[in-house]
A protein has these predicted regions:
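Conserved catalytic-loop aspartate of Hanks-type protein kinases
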Residues: 238
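Activation segment/activation loop of eukaryotic-type protein kinase catalytic domains
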Residues: 179-224
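Juxta-kinase regulatory segment immediately upstream of eukaryotic protein kinase catalytic domains
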Residues: 3-52, 85-88
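ATP-binding glycine-rich phosphate-binding loop
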Residues: 32-69, 74-78, 104
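The N-lobe alphaC helix and its flanking beta3-alphaC-beta4 segment of protein kinase-like domains
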Residues: 77-105
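Conserved structural core of kinase catalytic domains
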Residues: 105-157
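Catalytic-loop of the protein kinase fold
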Residues: 165, 169-187
Length: 248
């Protein structure tokens, strides 16, 4: 199933409803931490205080920034930095230098973040608001979090998702891991924001960065039984994953 088929399908439903610094290879240490606050620095050694930990995953943790409600910081776990440096920093730096056209709808890296020793430990990003798309796919949570949504509203949300994925594809950026928790829906505007973008497969000026994560149940047959970090996604394999979540 390609883009034309997906758009035709949703347009049909919609119409029916309308009528009815350089990488440093040495291991990085943790950010300066006192009690429950963490201090990090930009490339010019300007400090910023982090507050509440909002999320924690296998690669790192996401924190709020004191005095900046619109910005979040992701700090990678020390063991991740020790294992993946300098490649990880190279990828984030490439993303910083190649912002997509729809960066305003993405938690795309804004600046590099360092510890007190000026070792790279993560990045800052815009904070996106919305409800997880997982709620919209859940029969019970859907009614709780989207009580006024009808089928036409759902179609508008999914069309927003499709259009943004297609825009990224035109820029050689593949989502890779179609986790519904990484898409946030604004119930009012019916638009989708993307978070956890640092795992995306990207290609910038001849540099290729794979997406090292994914879900087997959303992976096309030709990519099964392979390490995700060795898989090269393309628009066809992406549409396979996208089609599955559209009908969840």
């Amino acid at each position: 199933m390609m883009w034309g088929s997906l758009f035709n399908l949703f347009n049909t439903v919609n119409a029916a409803q309308a009528t009815s610094p350089k990488p440093q290879p040495r291991p990085a240490q943790s950010a300066s931490q006192t009690m429950q606050t963490i201090t990090v620095y930009d490339a010019h050694k300007n400090p910023k205080t982090l507050e509440n930990m909002l999320a924690k995953g296998g690669e790192g943790s996401v924190y709020a920034v004191q005095g900046r409600s619109d910005v979040l910081v992701k700090l990678y776990h020390p063991e991740v930095l020790n294992k993946l440096q300098p490649h990880l920093q190279q990828k984030i730096t490439a993303m910083l230098n190649n912002k997509p056209n729809t960066a305003n709808l993405l938690s795309w890296p804004l600046i590099d973040v360092y510890n007190q020793q000026q070792q790279w430990i993560g990045y800052a990003m815009h904070r996106k608001q919305g409800l997880k798309l997982q709620f919209l796919a859940h029969a019970v949570l859907y009614k709780k979090h989207f009580p006024h949504f009808n089928r036409r509203d759902i179609v508008l949300v999914l069309l927003s998702l499709i259009e943004q994925v297609q825009s990224l594809h035109r820029q050689q950026i593949m989502i890779g891991d179609y986790n519904l928790n990484n898409f946030l829906c604004d119930p009012k505007s019916k638009t989708i924001s993307f978070i956890d973008c640092d795992s995306y497969q990207c290609q910038f000026n001849g540099q290729f960065f794979a997406c090292p994560v994914g879900s087997p149940d959303l992976t096309p047959p030709e990519h099964q039984n392979k390490s995700f970090k060795e898989v090269v996604r393309n628009s066809q394999s992406e549409v396979f994953s996208l089609a599955i979540i559209l009908f969840k």
